[in-house]
């Protein structure tokens, strides 16, 4: 009964968090101006995606940078995306790579997968499929669905690793369960 109650509470919290959306507000702006790194990051997300305001990459970059300067790793990862795409700043793929690697090394799963992509495509670094596989695998182990698909694809085709149909199936299945359509197609 205790396990069931814990599961119900966990599912309820997860659903509430999924439907909670950051939105621009005076309170958020005030908190960001007072130096709250999470508020700065959330405000940057509002500007980046247009949550409750107009999309403004320059303002997003400013707030991501402020939060990143204080060591907030989600903001460091977000800055890497800004530099990679030239959103709110001059495009700098080498800096994008360095920032993404920093966030990945600090344990950000999303950054690990993105770092794999950067290595695979040679964006901001020398192309290295072995390193791409390594970072995809770390992100996949952490539950990242896209990384699980990438690991499966690499195993299927022997990219950066020895081809292994059983491992490919295992990772396609993990990714498919999380809703990745390409993984579902490959099963």
Q: Locations of the language-model features?
A:
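Short coil/turn and helix-start
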Residues: 33, 51-55, 69, 85-91, ...
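Boundary at the C-terminal end of the N-terminal hydrophobic targeting segment
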Residues: 18-20, 25
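Sec-dependent N-terminal signal peptides
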Residues: 4-14
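Short, intrinsically disordered, charge-balanced linker/junction segments flanking boundaries
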Residues: 181-187
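Hydrophobic face of amphipathic alpha-helices that form TPR/SEL1-like repeat modules
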Residues: 42-49, 53, 76-85, 112-121, ...
């Amino acid at each position: 009964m205790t396990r069931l109650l814990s599961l119900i509470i966990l599912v309820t919290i997860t659903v509430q968090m999924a439907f909670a959306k950051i939105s621009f507000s005076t309170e958020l702006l005030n908190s960001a101006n007072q130096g709250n790194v999470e508020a700065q990051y959330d405000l940057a997300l509002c500007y980046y995606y247009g949550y409750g305001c107009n999309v403004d990459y320059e303002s997003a970059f400013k707030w991501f940078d402020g939060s990143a300067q204080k060591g907030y790793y989600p903001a460091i990862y977000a800055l890497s995306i800004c530099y990679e795409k030239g959103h709110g700043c001059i495009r700098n793929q080498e800096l994008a790579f360095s920032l993404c690697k920093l966030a990945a090394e600090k344990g950000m799963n999303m950054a690990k997968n993105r770092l794999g992509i950067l290595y695979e495509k040679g964006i901001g670094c020398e192309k290295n499929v072995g390193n791409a596989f390594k970072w995809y695998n770390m992100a996949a182990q952490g539950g990242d669905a896209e990384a699980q698909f990438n690991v499966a694809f690499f195993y299927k085709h022997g990219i950066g690793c020895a081809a292994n149909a059983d491992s490919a199936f295992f990772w396609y299945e993990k990714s498919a369960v999380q809703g990745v359509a390409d993984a579902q197609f490959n099963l």
